[in-house]
Amino acid sequence: MSAKAPRKKIRWDLWMIVTVGVSIFYMLFLLYPLISMLSKSVIGEDGGFTWQYFAKVFHKKYYQRAIWGSLKISATVTLITVLLATPLAYIMSTVKIRFAGALQILILVSSMSAPFIGAYAWIMLCGRNGTITNFLLNTFGFKLGDIYGFKGCVIVMSLQLYSLVFMFVSGAFKNLDNSLIEASESLGCSGVRKIFKIVLPLILPTLLSGALMVFMRTFADYGTPMLIGENYNTLPVVVYKEFLSEIGSSDGMAAAISIIAIVITTAVFLLQKYIANRKVFSMSALHPVEAKKLHGVKNVLAHAYCYILVGLAIMPQCYVIYSSFRNTS
């Protein structure tokens, strides 16, 4: 008989203690709440197993509208942020923009406030009795459109979250090898065709990662739809109403809706990973993209786009700072 191999003793060094601590933290604050929520979604009031909460979600139009509303607003905001942030990142990476460092700081600051603060500031600015609304009405006789509802949520979320896509795409442009772009131009691929044929395919995995972050943040946003959504319900708002209903709270319904939200976001995450993994490119930026100075109308348009977009996005933070020092007594 062969002798048994001696068992390896666990070495309780610093890294082992950190690993065990992180694992316990993960189980307590992530796995346990998920398991608890899953159990509440399938256990009825009598303590038995039931699918009644899920059946109610998929049979009542109220909950169906909330699911569709969350998907609709998340997809719309994601698309708009991609359309806003990608040109901004491209311009600031390839064109010499004055005060580019200050603009990048303002872009980061615009995304750092909580959704409640951003939504509240936009109500104070463009609400029915907002500062900008009254100024345009009293000065030019122009009545500003309503900031509330679906379009208001889209505007507020897009201006707050476009910075996520910008940061991802800016990093991708820094790792882009300019020799590929120069080679395409020497072969006759230039202008808009160069962007769609060469640049976008190279940054697509990173662009999808930024878009995923925006989708997740929008899908989970409670503050903005609650403040300016009015009758436009999303899943986080419905979960809150179910959990703290005046008629009678329902932990089971809130848990079932939360599980559905987790399933939807997980499916979107897996879809993004599948698409991104098929478009992965490995390259070393031996010849990185360098910002060049433009002249004439192109230079004016590039600066105008950057300043206007960043200016609109930073307005809520500026107004909050201004309001905190204003004497209202």
Regions found by a protein language model. Give the residues of each.
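Short, Lys/Arg-rich, polar N-terminal cytosolic tail immediately upstream
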Residues: 1-12
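Alpha-helical transmembrane segments of integral membrane proteins
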Residues: 7, 270-305
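Membrane-water interface segments at the C-terminal ends of transmembrane alpha-helices
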Residues: 11-45, 59-174, 202-222, 256-272, ...
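Short hydrophobic, aromatic-rich alpha-helical segments embedded in or entering the lipid bilayer
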Residues: 48-59, 230-242, 329
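Juxtamembrane helix-boundary/capping and inter-helix hinge elements in multi-pass membrane proteins
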Residues: 60, 95-98, 174-179, 189-191, ...
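Glycine-rich helix-loop "coupling/hinge" segments at transmembrane-helix boundaries
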Residues: 124, 222-248
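Helix-loop-helix hairpin linking two adjacent transmembrane segments in secondary transporters
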Residues: 240-264
